[in-house]
Swiss-Prot record:
This is Large-conductance mechanosensitive channel. Homopentamer. It comes from Thiobacillus denitrificans (strain ATCC 25259 / T1). Keywords: Cell inner membrane, Cell membrane, Ion channel, Ion transport, Membrane, Transmembrane, Transmembrane helix, Transport. InterPro entries: MS_channel, MSC/AndL, MscL_channel. Belongs to the MscL family. Channel that opens in response to stretch forces in the membrane lipid bilayer. May participate in the regulation of osmotic pressure changes within the cell. Its main location: membrane. The keyword Ribonucleoprotein does not apply. Gene3D superfamilies: Large-conductance mechanosensitive channel, MscL, domain 1 (1.10.1200.120). It comes from the Bacteria.
Length: 141
């Protein structure tokens, strides 16, 4: 089997197509989660903490030249190495929200997939019933 035909067979399988669709939807969904965090959650968190913006949190690893504003963009522009942990906090919130949403979706799908409560066992075939009756009649003699 040639490489091209093996590749076609692989792509034609449902699993590969499902994976491709999942990746595309996941990429689009991550933008929705990023918007939820950036546009809805972080402003509320900022309001609770007095207008605090997590994306500008940083620790300067060198001395900041005098006259440079103490914002992340300005300190980076001045060439000072920084630990920008505020962006990490935002990305971490994105991840936690995405993980929670995926967990809820998978949980609901698993609930839908659960088998129905056990059905009553099927009645034994008529010949088995007759054989049991004969056996019981012979035991009584």
């Amino acid at each position: 089997m040639s490489f091209a035909s093996e590749f076609k067979q692989f792509i034609a399988k449902g699993n590969a197509m499902d994976l491709a669709v999942g990746v595309i939807i996941g990429a689009a969904f991550s933008k929705i989660v990023a918007s939820i965090v950036d546009d809805l959650i972080m402003p509320i968190v900022g309001a609770v903490f007095g207008g605090f913006d997590f994306s500008n949190l940083f620790i300067a690893l060198g001395s900041v030249p005098e006259g440079v504003a103490l914002t992340l963009a300005e300190v980076r522009k001045a060439g000072v190495p920084v630990l920008a942990y505020g962006n990490f906090v935002t990305v971490l919130l994105n991840f936690l929200i995405l993980a929670l949403i995926v967990f809820i979706i998978v949980r609901q799908i698993n609930r839908l997939k659960r088998p129905a409560p056990g059905a009553a066992p099927a009645a034994p075939p008529e010949d088995i019933v007759l054989l049991r009756e004969i056996r019981d009649a012979l035991r009584q003699k």
